[in-house]
Amino acid sequence: MLPINNNFSLPQNSFYNTISGTYADYFSAWDKWEKQALPGEERDEAVSRLKECLINNSDELRLDRLNLSSLPDNLPAQITLLNVSYNQLTNLPELPVTLKKLYSASNKLSELPVLPPALESLQVQHNELENLPALPDSLLTMNISYNEIVSLPSLPQALKNLRATRNFLTELPAFSEGNNPVVREYFFDRNQISHIPESILNLRNECSIHISDNPLSSHALQALQRLTSSPDYHGPRIYFSMSDGQQNTLHRPLADAVTAWFPENKQSDVSQIWHAFEHEEHANTFSAFLDRLSDTVSARNTSGFREQVAAWLEKLSASAELRQQSFAVAADATESCEDRVALTWNNLRKTLLVHQASEGLFDNDTGALLSLGREMFRLEILEDIARDKVRTLHFVDEIEVYLAFQTMLAEKLQLSTAVKEMRFYGVSGVTANDLRTAEAMVRSREENEFTDWFSLWGPWHAVLKRTEADRWAQAEEQKYEMLENEYPQRVADRLKASGLSGDADAEREAGAQVMRETEQQIYRQLTDEVLALRLSENGSQLHHS
């Protein structure tokens, strides 16, 4: 950084004489502003950066993370990028007309000044904005999430990406598309939007609109689903959720939420145990999740469900690692609809079983471990199928799609971790034919791919390390010998064959491929040996219907 001399004088005819205000005017104003600093502000550093920007005629000015409560009125007139994020700003001064990118996230702004006519990127998320000024026609991207905005001004035709999550919007802006080729992605999740304007259909089918967790009326949802399901629909893809966006953010103490799942004669002891976990990360959201779980279809209709949850909670209380994993999995489950809670319960049961397998529960029961692995494999394939299905839908709640495949195929595919009922299957877009095709695909891929998958599965490796230490050590030695003797040549041969010798990115990719192939070969051989021995001893079999 250049040393700053407040008495520095510029030579005559410098470029500074051509911009608004003189060099001395800038320095004098900035020095005065610096002297008015509040405790904790790094205005000295800010002034140093301002002067350096002016001296070097830089087009970027970065004053972020300096705990500033204000900015000087006269910013360098030549800048095209201004970053003042993560300060304590309540307002911004007049902005240079040359500005193209404005970053002012995580401040305390309640309003914005007039925006420069050439502005292309506006990033003002996490502020206290209640409205926006007119948006320039040049604007391409805008993030206004986590503010208090009630309505939006007209959107520029050029705007490609808009993030307006977590505001107080009650309606969407009007969309006018015409022949505009811009592919747009707009996020309006978690607002107060209750209806969708017909103008949304003016957008191209390559565009995406996200409106999850809004209080959309059932009439609006039905109308949109009917319209977007039409064979001649060519509008945008619309992501929604069955949540009404009105989840209660209040929660009761963790111990109270847990003890509610236990019989009265156990509640005192359970409460005492769980009081110790009140301050663990995500404990509050886990408490809210348990209360939401008690109101799901499965909790109301499935015999033994409460006992199942209580047994699971006992296991969590005995394992800090499992509890930490489970709290994290449940962290976002209360921010969406009932079926999101149900899908999270599925994932929590998977987490429990995989944890138990890794900790040794199935060390002496290879058949049970294979069954668990097979279920995890089937669930992975169903997730792939659900992901592909989501891409085909124009009006989609992703949660309902993922849960639909698990719930509707739980019995046929023997999915012990899947709930047997869901509330909103009707809006999932998953048809009976989709389910038949999915079942056939799972069985086909299981027949051809499961043993390879199982040989690389982490819990199986944990079992091998504990119970087949010598064989595991031999396999690891074989792998490292290959890395030392064969790996470099195999990577070089692959790069040469593809004409990419000397390409660093291609070398990394080729190296990863060779490593995967080597591990697949070595661990598959080890798996075949161990399974052949164990399954012949207890009469189990690798393939399962």
From Swiss-Prot:
- Residue spans of the LRR repeats: 57-77, 78-99, 100-117, 118-139, 140-157, 158-179, 182-203, 205-228
GO molecular function terms listed in the Swiss-Prot or TrEMBL record: ubiquitin protein ligase activity; ubiquitin-protein transferase activity
Q: Which organism is it from?
A: Shigella flexneri serotype X (strain 2002017)
Lineage: superkingdom: Bacteria
Compartments, as annotated in UniProt: Secreted; Host cytoplasm; Host nucleus
In the UniProt record, the gene name given for this protein reads ipaH9.8
Query: Annotated region Linker: where?
Result: 243-250
The keyword Transcription regulation is assigned to this record? no
Summarize the subunit comment: Also interacts with human and mouse U2AF1 (U2AF35).
The UniProt activity regulation field reads: Exists in an autoinhibited state in the absence of substrate protein, due to interactions of the leucine-rich repeats with NEL domain. Is activated upon binding to a substrate protein.
Enzyme Commission identifier(s):
2.3.2.27
Q: Where is this region: Interaction with target proteins?
A: 1-242
Q: Which keywords are on file for this protein?
A: Host cytoplasm, Host nucleus, Leucine-rich repeat, Plasmid, Repeat, Secreted, Transferase, Ubl conjugation, Ubl conjugation pathway, Virulence
Q: Which family does it belong to?
A: Belongs to the LRR-containing bacterial E3 ligase family.
Q: How is it modified after translation?
A: Ubiquitinated in the presence of host E1 ubiquitin-activating enzyme, E2 ubiquitin-conjugating enzyme and ubiquitin.
**The protein, known as:** E3 ubiquitin-protein ligase ipaH9.8
Report the catalytic activity: S-ubiquitinyl-[E2 ubiquitin-conjugating enzyme]-L-cysteine + [acceptor protein]-L-lysine = [E2 ubiquitin-conjugating enzyme]-L-cysteine + N(6)-ubiquitinyl-[acceptor protein]-L-lysine
| Chain positions covered by the region annotation E3 ubiquitin-protein ligase catalytic domain | 251-545
Task: Identify the GO cellular component terms for this protein.
Answer: extracellular region; host cell cytosol; host cell nucleus
